Amino acid sequence: MDLTESFKTLSDKAIFTIAGVGQRDGIPAKEADAGWPLGVVRRPDGDLIVVDYQWHRIWRIDKDGILHAFAGDGIAGRSGDDGPAIEARFCNPHDLFQDRHGHLYLSDLGNNTIRRIDYETGVITLVAGTGQVGRGGDGGLAIEAEMDCSCGVAVDEAGYIYLSSEWTNNIRRIDPKNGLIETVFGQIARHYPSEQGHSRPFAGSGLSLGGYHGDGGSAKEAGFNHPEHLVFDSMGNLYVCDNSNDRIRKIDMKSEIITTVLGNGQRASNGDGGPAIEASILMPDAICLDVHDNLYVGEKYGFRIRKVEHETGMVRTLVGTGEPGFGEEGLHGSVTRCNSVEAGIYADPDGTVFWGDCSGRTRRYDGQTGIVTTILGGTSVHDDEAAVGGFLNGPGGLSVGPDGHIYVADVWNQRIRAIDPFTGIIRAIAGSGA
């Protein structure tokens, strides 16, 4: 397609797409252009639900692999509570938890809120947060409390909702009977929101910054360092993804004793084939448990998916070589590269694992064969093809060269790409996506 001729025929104020397919549903998910898929769970009906952090939506992938819009209209904002989730607006939705009834709890990170989608009705409601960044509200209603980077959410069998506060380094709990919120684990830090919307420590007695201590004692007095995600096992114990301590920790909810189950605190990724507590993990940023209580962990900077066997306590790598990259398609997990794994990971009973990585895809590890495939986001960015069919993931800066070539910073695909004005073909001129 000769773009120069198309431009000549444009009328005033007309819009003409020259690159990118945008947000499409009703097509095979593996052919869709996703933004940044993070949280992922399987619904009781068998469909997969995927959070798209970048495009402010939640997707549904049906059993035939077709992609459907599930919640959100794709425009960043905060609206729609007490109405259909499909009409709601989110801002950088992050983590996702499904309770035993199929209800979904969502960390709407950019809005500093926790929201719930009813399984039967599809209605979305506010669970916690005023939208203000901060730490206040303990002892009062959760919907009147401030949130400070509450990435992780988990719900126990009794309906109590647990939130991990990444920047205040503790865990809060919401009582389902009265809606009150309190801090239950981790020393209480006092913070205030900065001009940039981040949380900074406020000097004074009782201040607790991130750290590592407390194993073997009460979780109430334990030190966490950016606890990001939470999950319960079949016995009701709470697992904490203690990100910057490079550990996964477990809280016995009967005794409230905390221990480490994976990671020795070294900033590395090794120890496969040995005890998980002697191994190292590099910034764990996603955790889940299967029905057998096997633990699965995604490493943000180790670029791996690791598994800890419940029966033996031994750890091994399922996917990843330790080198970041777009990742090979259809190969065994042992030779397939991962990009950073953040927030989203889910495991079926047979050990099949789904996760989102920062290449803009949701991927699948087959628990029987070990083969890795892409289920959402495409296996290619479609270089050397017509730009209108190309995948752009967070296009940023744009410039036109003296020869008419259009240059685009394809941010999340980690490339600089050029569009030929005479052929309409897009190609990468810098960056490999790694």
Where are these regions (language model features)?
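Conserved beta-strand position repeated once per blade in WD40 beta-propeller domains
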Residues: G39, D95, G152, H229, ...
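Conserved beta-propeller blade signature
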Residues: D47-I49, H103-Y105, Y160-L163, N237-Y239, ...
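Short loop/turn segments immediately following the C-termini of beta-strands
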Residues: Y53, L109, E166-W167, N243, ...
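Residue-level detector of Asp-centered blade-edge/turn motifs that repeat once per structural unit
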Residues: R42-D45, Q98-H101, V155-A158, F232-M235, ...
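A short loop-to-beta-strand structural motif that recurs across blades of beta-propeller domains
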Residues: H56-W59, N112-R116, V123, N169-R173, ...
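Blade-level signature of beta-propeller repeat domains, shared across WD40, Kelch, NHL, RCC1
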Residues: A347, I406-I425, A430
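Gly/Pro-rich loop segments of beta-rich domains
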Residues: D2-W36, I66-N92, G122-C149, G179-H226, ...
